[in-house]
Amino acid sequence: PFGISVDLAHELGKHLGVEVELVVFDAAGKSVEAVTNEQADVGFFAVDPVRGQGISFTAPYVLIEGAYLVREDSPITANEQVDQPGTVVTVGKGSAYDLYLTRALKSATIFRAPTSPTVVDVFVEQAHDVAAGVRQQLEYDTMRHSGLRLLPGRFMVIQQAMGLPKSR
């Protein structure tokens, strides 16, 4: 594994003088569950009040934009137009933006893909109206699937932080 979370884990281990054992999960919800249940000592998460019930967070170390993706021919042109009756929004199950949109969307229907990396594939296969996700992932997905466009702006900012079980 590689990336900022892996680098931070190794730096934390050095600072504490302990060996780091990395455990990789394929979905954020599984990682949250492992830390909440003390099956892992530290995790790297998007800060969310629901997750905060079982996890204590550090100050955020990065901000990530949540964005929407639609088909090029979609009549939806702005984030404010997404929350309409009959609109189906595909999200990654248990992701930070799933938790946020579950609270924020009042009229649209949320459909949960198994993981965040599968959101756009499910959105395309199921012919849903909107895909929600991390901007960088959605930008990558527009290169894999033609005929898609990102809506301008963002619907949320995700604060990424280290977290440990509340019980500690």
Outline where the language-model segments fall.
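Flexible hinge/capping segments at coil-to-helix
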Residues: A59-Y61, V70-V89
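Short loop->beta-strand "edge-of-pocket" segments that line small-molecule binding or catalytic clefts
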Residues: P1-F2, E80-Y97, A108-I110
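A ligand-binding cleft/hinge motif common to bilobed small-molecule-binding domains
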Residues: G29, F45-G54, Y100-R103, D121-M156
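Periplasmic-binding protein-like
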Residues: V62-E72, P117-T118, R135, E139-R168
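Hydrophobic residues within well-ordered alpha-helices
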Residues: L12, V35-T36, V82, V122-V124, ...
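A local structural motif
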Residues: K14-V24, P85-G86, T102-P114, A127
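Short helix-initiation/N-cap motifs at beta->coil->alpha
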Residues: E21-E33, I76-T77, F111-V122, I158
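Extracytoplasmic small-molecule ligand-binding "clamshell" domains
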Residues: P1-A46, R51
